[in-house]
Regions:
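Short proline/glycine-enriched turn/loop motifs at strand-loop junctions of beta-rich domains
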Residues: 25-31, 67
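Short beta-strand segments in beta-sandwich/barrel cores
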Residues: 31-32, 135
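Beta-strand signatures of extracellular beta-sandwich domains
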Residues: 33-35, 73
Length: 144
């Protein structure tokens, strides 16, 4: 795992062929670090200073890293923070179990950008034939 120059946009995590780019908005006067953990393990694995900034956007990229094997958070002025642009969380797998970000129990996970849609496409239903409703899915299925 090596640190290389990152790019500021888009914010969040971007996975490319051979590197992962991290980008987050942090006020200039605050110190920011990237925390890397091995997936499923409690202890911090590596820590990187995020010194490169474009305005208030800090960025860093890592090469030689397998996304499925790692998780991440940020340390901003001594406070562990989950990425506000995170696509998936680790540590929230069980409903109602309280965990704390400060204890490194909740972290960002990496999602693969590749998904095989197997020829799926949008439904071609005329609007006047649609029956639509909304509900809170997690609350609706909580006791199922």
């Amino acid at each position: 795992m090596r640190e290389v120059q990152g790019y500021p946009l888009p914010l969040g995590v971007q996975i490319s062929e051979n590197k992962i780019n991290f980008s987050i908005a942090v006020p200039i006067e605050k110190k920011c670090q990237l925390l890397i953990y091995r997936a499923g393990r409690k202890r911090l694995y590596r820590q990187f200073e995020m010194e490169t900034a474009v305005g208030e956007v800090r960025c860093i990229a890592l090469t030689d890293i397998e996304p499925a094997e790692y998780e991440y958070n940020y340390l901003i002025n001594g406070e562990v923070v989950v990425d506000p642009y995170v696509q998936a969380l680790a540590g929230r797998e069980h409903w109602g179990v309280k965990k704390e970000t400060a204890r490194h129990e909740i972290r960002g996970r990496f999602l693969s950008q590749e998904y095989d849609w197997e020829g799926d496409h949008t439904l071609q239903i005329p609007y006047h034939q649609v029956i639509a409703y909304s509900l809170h899915v997690r609350g609706f299925t909580r006791h199922a």
